[in-house]
Each structure stands twice: as C-alpha cells, then as structure tokens.
C-alpha cells in the first residue's frame, strides 16, 4: 500500500541525487522515464503512469492534464503517431516541484500556442499547448536529431535552476500573452 507522502518506486530509470546549475544545487527526489507506443489508445496508460508517480503531489492533477495534451499532440502531429512510433514520458520530482517532459520523434512543423479566444483561429485545434502553458509554471521545447521534447515545470524553481525552469530547452514560455 502506498502512502500519500512516499515517493513511489518504479523499476524504470530512477535517478536520485542533485542537479547543479551555477552555484546552486537542487535535490532531485526521483526521475523516471518510460516509452509508450505512439497511438491514441496509450494516452490513458501514460496518464496512469504519471498519476501513480505523483501520488500526494499538489501538482498531480495539472500535470496529468498537461501530459495528456502533450502526448496527444505527439501522436497527432509528429512522426511518433506513425506505425511503430514511440512517445517517451519523463517525470522528475523535487521537494517543491515537478517536471513533465514528452519526447516525440519529431516533425517538420513547429509547435504553436494559439489563444482559443482569438478570432480567426480554428475552433478545433491549437488549444492543447495553450492549456499546458496556462497550467504549468513554465513550458518550453527543443528539437534535436532524435525528435522534439516539450517540457512543463510546476511549482517552485529557483532562479539559478534555469535548466529546470526552461527545462534546458529553447523557446521557453511562461504563459501566453
């Protein structure tokens, strides 16, 4: 039986230690990563994965919503949604926050955050990143040869830990203007 204040254990990639940035250190309680097939039916499995890891976290509900949006975008808009595609989810916890990162297999298009209230925007798309930007304290992404990673940080992240706030990624977004 799991207690609400315990950090769940998982047999995947777990790292415990400190991340350094400049002069400061941030103690990471745990970090997990898991790859899922890039198909719509696996979004719920990814949500359960994150929900289990964030039991007792005040960021759990928002993190699950953001994960769902990012995973769905990866399946619908990137090569991860093609036959045999994968989506990797990474969850990192520290005492005052959580980071959710979703890595897909890339695409030629770039992520766009659309304000659903703006006139002229398609009514049925573009809301996922807007919602993620509203719920997360920080949202950022980058591309590399393996694909695209979009990461959302929740909670308190000290200014000297920009690698967690912007998740070491270009295009940081702290909300939509």
Locate predicted features.
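Conserved beta-strand-loop-beta-strand hairpin that lines the nucleotide-binding pocket
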Residues: 1-33, 75-177
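STAS-typified acidic loop motif
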Residues: 33-43
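Conserved short strand/loop->alpha-helix "switch" segment adjacent to the catalytic nucleotide/phosphoryl-transfer site
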Residues: 45-68, 121
